Amino acid sequence: MKKILSDLEDKIKNKTSIICLTEDYCINPMWAHYADNHNGVCIEYDFKNISNFIFKILCFPIEYVEKSNNTLELSALFDDNIKTNPVWPLRLVLRKSHDWQYEKEWRLIVSQFFKDFFYEKNHGDVYFDEYYSDKHYIKFIKPKSIYLGLDIDLKDEEKLIDICKFRKINVYKMKKDKSGYNLKSEPILEF
């Protein structure tokens, strides 16, 4: 059983890429953990008005749970779920401990499982090759805004502002609020 589960895990890893997103760019620990301790950037996308089918089917909220029950979940992979629902095995990468729920995370999953499912089921006008390749690249939407970290390097800041000016992307700089504990953004460049 361990060998089967290990092989399945390898298959999922080799055929899947994940982009992690959050609903809130002002979470201090997120800047510390994922943006090089406030030296990096946060990129904002507007998914509300997206008409692109691929993003509607590939973006999932994280489920925050008290306790992982992967053994029961993995055993269920051997029934018909996997044949009829390509998202089912991806549930394994859509759960995290409830300790992380402050992240308000979503994951964009780019997986061969989806491609195989849609070709096999012939889902109308879905042409995966337009969005996806075997190298896990997808055409992504234009960022709405870039948020520069509190401690971003000045040269990096200038380069990003130049790029955003050319691409007509809003730029904001993160600052501490009056309390000194919370973050807020101040506009540098808006379109």
Indicate where each model-derived feature is located.
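Catalytic-core loop-and-flanking beta/alpha module that positions acidic residues
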Residues: M1-F191
